[in-house]
Each structure stands twice: as structure tokens, then as C-alpha cells.
Amino acid sequence: MFEPTAIYAPNPHRYDTMTYNRAGTSGLKLPAVSLGFWHNFGDITPFDQMKSLVFTAFDNGITHFDLANNYGPEPGQAEKNCGLLLAKYFKHHRDELVISTKAGYEMWTGPYGDLGSRKYLLASLDQSLERLGLDYVDIFYHHRMDPNTPLEETMGALATAVQSGKAIYAGLSNYNGETLEKATAILNELHVPFVL
């Protein structure tokens, strides 16, 4: 369907006007604006429209592409389409990009298809990497709190993701302040680079 790579010459001045800020206390810099793949990257959006959005973003210094395993429609489709774009146009720019993905919402049926168990998170990350066509993501987030799974298990799964080289940083999304503080303490104790 797509040739492996195609010529894309990004704007040579793409970094001149974008502001980049450190993510938390890490050394990672994120652009002031990120490109979220929640909408406009599912199976109902024409590929040329997706390509135009990504090119416009990157040409303006937007280097953070934010995904989740369930973004679509259909679940997983945004990661698949991002993977096609990366393979076709951004192969030589991977080190200029911060690719993040998340897991926590329902992705498949049965008792292991959502929330925060070690089994779900690590399986989800492997599936996301396959859809994206990548060896690693820059940030792997737990997408929502899971009151029924011990926080130590969920943070341990994020630690495993980083220690295995499948993620560079761990992140948390949709956590309340109290739980975020506890999770941060666990990640710090495990020496896991944590950005958000």
C-alpha cells in the first residue's frame, strides 16, 4: 500500500519559534504544543489529511506526538496510522520526535483488557509498539487510575517497561493529586525516569 520511505523535506527553520519546556524535573524537553492523535487519525480520516496534519505540526516545531492504545476509531487505529506515517516519512527524523502512548482503557474483551494490571500494561505496550512499528516509545503512560490493582503493581509494570528499553520515561494520566503523590514516590524509589 505504501512504499517504505518517501521524500519529505521538513521546514529547516522548524525549531526557530517553538518554545520547549522541561517535562517535570527530567531532562526531556517538550514543545509548548503537542499533536494529539485522539481525533483525526482513525480509520475514517483520509490518509492525506493525516499526513497534512503531521507535516504542518512538525514543520512548526511540534515534535511530541501523543497517542493511546485505544485511540481510533477503531481502537488501535491511530497507532497504526502513526506507524505508517513514521515509516513512510519520518524514518530519518525519529530522534527528533517524542512519541508517547498510553494504556488503561478497555482494549480487548475479557478480564485482562483494561485498567492497571501488570499483565495488561505490558501486553498493551508490546501491541502498541507493533502497531507503531517502533522498538520503543519515549513516554509510556498509565492512562487512568485503577482502584482495584495495587499501585505498586502498576508502577512496577511501568518500571519494567522502562528497564526493558521499551520506554524511556514513565508517565501518569488522569490521576488525582493524592494518588499521583503516592505513585511518584514509588517510581522514585524504583529509580524510574518519570516525566508527568
What feature does the model see in each segment?
Residues M1-L97, Q163:
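N-terminal binding-site loop/beta-alpha segment at the start of enzyme catalytic domains
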Residues F2-T17, M145-L196:
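Beta/alpha (TIM)-barrel catalytic core signal, keyed to glycine-rich beta->alpha loops juxtaposed to Asp/Glu
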Residues R22, L30-S34, T63-H64, E96-K102, ...:
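Structural preference for beta-strand elements that scaffold enzyme active sites
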Residues G36-D48, E106-L122, H143-T149:
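Active-site mouth loops of central-metabolism enzymes
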Residues W38-N40, A68-N70, K102-E106, H142-M145, ...:
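Active-site beta-loop-alpha junctions enriched in small/polar residues
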Residues I44-F58, D114-G133, E153, L180-A185:
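Short, acidic/polar
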Residues N60, K91, E130-Y136, A161-K166:
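A structural motif corresponding to the C-terminal end of an alpha-helix
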Residues L129-T149:
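Active-site groove signature of glycoside hydrolases
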